[in-house]
């Protein structure tokens, strides 16, 4: 058949092109509306991982995040308006859930008013210290042939523990060191272990009858490595703060740390040593108070700082062969829940 020529053919061609454009626009609009429906109305069992196209999956993920953020913002504004409208009658703000306040209850949690606890404290190994019958005298030593950071860390520890002496081991076993410490009236033995010139362990032995605690040490920061540090610590006796040692085991560890420092701190020196237990990690900090006015006070860290994790608690003095252990950390058996702590 012969094709039509002239103005009628041109008219028909324009009409066809116009209809095609309208169809494509309608198709795009339909596709966009479908996309919005997919973003806003996903089936309940739908998972973004089911989308095979990576770009499409990322796009959908971003959209979902944005929508959730908008919903949270709207809900927050609504609650704020309700609280402002109620004024003093508004209910108290809900306490946010944390691992600490969701902690699994431990049966060995210590009650300070318990008579049995008071009797144990009056007869345990630390009773002479708390009854002021003995004065702390500490011997700080290291593993054989210490190097680098371990040496500097040991020296800085002696500067923040009053009445402490540093002696480097020369191949002498701990079993031989302990009787010598007892004969020279030392009340505690502190041993810094190292691996590849880095401190990685701490053994604390209370003398003469124990107990002995073994800690993993990490995150050691010496004074030189700290920012905005204060001047060198003075010889004043510091205050000691023990936080969150709530269980029977934690109570024993807290008393062990307290027995390192002498009684009657010198408040003139404004120095404080803090042992803060959080999720079975013991954070040590050494600060100085800065009194800005009669009502305002600040703190300035002096260093060093480090973190301890209890590995074992042994009855009596150090004995790796025949020692009786009160508590040993068994990771695969004990760390079954993130909300269960031992200290």
Curated annotation (Swiss-Prot):
SUPFAM superfamilies of this UniProt entry? Class II aaRS ABD-related (SSF52954)
- Role noted for this protein: May be required for ribosome biogenesis.
Species whose genome carries this gene? Xenopus laevis
Compartment(s): Nucleus, Nucleolus
Q: Which GO terms describe its molecular function?
A: RNA binding; rRNA primary transcript binding
Q: Does the keyword RNA-binding apply?
A: yes
Checking SMART domains in the record gives: Brix
Q: Where is this region: Disordered?
A: 1-51, 77-97
Q: What is its main location?
A: nucleus
Q: What is this protein called?
A: Ribosome production factor 1
> Which Gene3D superfamilies did the record assign?
Probable brix-domain ribosomal biogenesis protein (3.40.50.10480)
